Curated annotation (Swiss-Prot):
Organism expressing this protein natively: Myxococcus xanthus (strain DK1622)
Protein task: Nucleotidyltransferase involved in the post-translational modification of proteins. It can catalyze the addition of adenosine monophosphate (AMP) or uridine monophosphate (UMP) to a protein, resulting in modifications known as AMPylation and UMPylation.
Active site: 252 (proton acceptor)
Name this protein carries in UniProt: Protein nucleotidyltransferase YdiU
Alphabetized PANTHER family for the sequence: PROTEIN ADENYLYLTRANSFERASE SELO, MITOCHONDRIAL (PTHR32057:SF14)
């Protein structure tokens, strides 16, 4: 294991030509202190939890005393926000502290969120609030536990300093990790400002660092774009399969590596509601749960437009044409796994569609249903009450269950083996908004024990965790269908 002082920085992004961002001196909270740390993320940097308890950890990660090799840097980008192009955004309250090479040679961005104003703050204070910091910290680990590509939180630095939003809130900073923070909107910025040489420089940088098999190859830009299309299709299929709504799928929130990026007004489904809107600012439902696959394609088309100085229109169209088949294949693979099916059959799509229609009509809890379905007894006449009782009118479930039973029999499914498979892919725990709010309320009162407890539970969401059972329950009345603000 390493010490802080042994971290190896290789700041490739900060070494790009002028115009990719701005070097910034962080303005951390003077009373910043470590209030939660993620041991699993520390391990990626070869650091121990004990190393994080050193005062130097807070000073370095909070930006007060950067480590040798750190070069705090705010990245510039643009983006389509709710379908409207905004020509200049950038890291308004975030900083790339530096890029660390781990012992295996993998590279990790260390990103500080809430470290004060930057040239891209657009009049804002550059701060983050504890509420949104906890939500992002926990959801990053929840998504990682679910096997979904994501940024991850290294730790939360708390403060007593007030931050002024719609109300006065408690300030905090998040130390975030990811292989890269390059976005679709990064390419858009250089394209629409007609800096075509920077579009090529950025593409070559991303290819060299993250798609090295394409470096120097003929046709590399078209192949790169096709790979981004594939990764994005896979990511959104994974979101849909676990019932995750991002809430603000602007192109500046889309990762070029297919990571879940920028957790804001997200939400996991409680009842299965295809049109679920988790962002209360999304009055037209542009980013509703069932619109995410369509928006993924729209965003990729925006990226393709930004790459047209590197690829032809025919190459862009060919890459985009792979999106829907890739999405469909990934989504159905996930749904077959959730249903415990081993074989691929033509009728599977209809089986899933029929189930979804019945779940939506009956307002069945999405996560709890699939977890319980693992215990479905497939023998004719077997007791199916644990799942059946989730439907107010059980006859609707019975009709689907007959088809499901026949489908299981057709591939010779064995209940015990199927149960084991389904338990590995259907989580017991997701970060429901009401659970996050409970952790936030306690933390705002100075108690971070639930934040730490949930971090552990969500990192292993398929296990039973008997002492966390209340957080697998259906939400209380006050916690149903919560919509969340973009304010952070």
């Amino acid at each position: 294991m390493a010490t802080l002082e042994q971290l190896r920085f290789d700041n490739t992004y900060a070494r790009l030509p002028a115009g990719f961002g701005a070097r910034v001196h962080p303005s951390p909270f003077p009373d910043a202190k470590l209030v939660s740390v993620n041991p699993a993320a520390l391990k990626l940097l070869d650091l121990t939890p004990e190393e994080a308890q050193r005062p130097e950890f807070v000073a370095a990660m909070g930006g007060a005393k950067p480590l040798p090799g750190m070069e705090p840097f705010a990245m510039v980008y643009a983006g389509h926000q709710f379908g409207v192009y905004v020509p200049r955004l950038g890291d308004g309250r975030a900083l790339l502290l530096g890029e660390v090479r781990d012992a295996a040679g993998a590279k990790w961005d260390l990103h500080l969120k809430g470290g004060g104003p930057t040239p891209f703050s657009r009049g804002g204070d550059g701060r983050a609030v504890l509420r949104s910091t906890i939500r992002e910290y926990l959801c990053g680990e929840a998504m990682h536990g679910l096997g979904i590509p994501t940024t991850r939180g290294l730790g939360i630095l708390g403060s007593q300093a007030p931050v002024y939003r719609e109300a006065v809130e408690t300030g905090a900073m998040l130390v975030r990790m990811a292989p890269s923070h390059v976005r679709f909107g990064t390419f858009e910025f250089f394209h629409y400002t007609e800096q075509t040489e920077h579009v090529a420089t950025l593409a070559d940088h991303v290819i060299t660092e993250h798609f090295p098999q394409l470096a120097g190859q003929e046709g590399r830009y078209a192949r790169f774009y096709t790979e981004v299309v594939e990764r994005t299709a896979r990511l959104i299929a994974q979101w849909q399969a676990v019932g995750f709504a991002h809430g603000v799928m602007n192109t500046d929130n889309m990762s070029i590596l297919g990571l879940t990026l920028d957790y804001g007004p997200f939400g996991f489904l409680d009842d299965f509601e295809p049109g679920f809107i988790c962002n209360h600012s999304d009055d037209r439902g542009r980013y509703a749960f069932d619109q995410q696959p369509r928006i993924g394609l729209w965003n990729l088309a925006c990226l393709g437009e930004a790459l047209l100085t590197l690829i032809s229109e025919d190459e862009a169209r060919a890459a985009l044409a792979t999106y829907q088949p890739a999405y469909n294949a990934h989504f159905m693979d996930r749904m077959r796994a959730k249903l415990g099916l081993r074989e691929t059959r033509d009728e599977d799509r209809e089986l899933v569609s029929d189930l979804f229609a019945r779940m939506a009509e009956a307002h069945v809890d999405y996560t709890r249903f699939f977890r319980a379905l693992g215990h479905f007894a497939s023998a004719d006449g077997a007791d199916t009450r644990p799942v059946r009782d989730m439907f107010p009118a059980p006859e609707g479930f019975d009709a689907w269950a007959g088809r499901y039973r026949a489908r299981l029999a057709a591939e010779g499914s064995v209940d015990a083996e199927r149960h084991a498979r389904m338990t590995r892919v259907n989580p017991k725990y997701v970060l429901r908004n009401w659970v996050a709010q409970e952790a936030i309320s306690r933390a705002e009162a100075g108690d971070f024990s639930l934040v730490d407890r949930l971090l552990g539970v969500l990192s292993d969401p398929f296990a039973e965790h008997p002492d966390a059972e209340p957080y697998a329950a259906a939400p209380p009345t006050w916690g149903r269908h919560l919509a969340v603000s973009c304010s952070s």
